[in-house]
Amino acid sequence: MNETRRVRWIVRVGVWLIRALASTWRMETVNGEPLAAARRSGQQVLFALWHGELLPLLWHQRGENVAIVISEHRDGEIIAQIAESLGYSTVRGSSSKGGSRALIGLMREIDAGRDGAITPDGPRGPARVFAPGAVVAAQRTGALIAPIRASASRAWRLKSWDRFLIPKPFARVTVSFGPLTSVVADSPRAAAEHAPRLQAILDAVPGS
C-alpha cells in the first residue's frame, strides 16, 4: 500500500471512530455566551487550545467555519484530513517548521472571514508553553483570543509529550471558555511579549 492510500485509509477509519465515539459523549459548555455574543456582532476570534486537549475541542467546534493550524510533519497530514472532514479549513505549519508561512496563512484565513484556531504548544511541545504565534496573529488581524479547554469525566491518556486526552465512551465532556482577550501592541515583536499573559489566562481555564 503506497503512502497516499495508507493515509486515506487511516483518515477514513479515524473519522468513523471519532464520530462513533464522540456521538456518545455528553457535552457541556461553560462560559460560552461571550463567544456567542462576539460572533453575533461580527467579531472574529482566534481559539487557543493546548495540544493535548485537541480531540474533544475539534469535535466541539466542528462545522463552524474555523481555520486551524496543523503541523507539516507526516502525522499532521492525517490530522489535517480528519479536521477537514469535520468542516475545518487547515493551514499547514508550526513554530518549528513552516511557522512563518503558517502564521501568514492563518492571518489570511481570518482576513477572509473565518475564525482561527491554534495550539500554541504544538506540534512537539514543550507542553503547555505558549508560543507567540497566536498573539502575533491576533495583533495583526484584530481577532480576539478565545482561550478554550476541555476535560472529561472518564478518559484515556496517551503516553505522549502532551498526554493526549481521549474521552471514553459516554463520558461527560466539559468545554470551558476563558475571557476573550485582545492583543494591543505596536508591532509583532511587542505583541509576542503578551505570550506569558495569555499562557496564564489559558492555564486558569478549567481543563484536563
State each model region's role.
Residues 44-97, 157:
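Catalytic core of membrane glycerolipid acyltransferases/transacylases, capturing the structured
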Residues 35-36, 58, 80, 134-135:
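Short amphipathic alpha-helical segments and helix-helix/interface helices
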Residues 1-24, 39, 62-67, 85, ...:
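Non-catalytic C-terminal accessory region of glycerolipid acyltransferases
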Residues 33-35, 53, 74, 124, ...:
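Residues that cap or initiate secondary-structure elements
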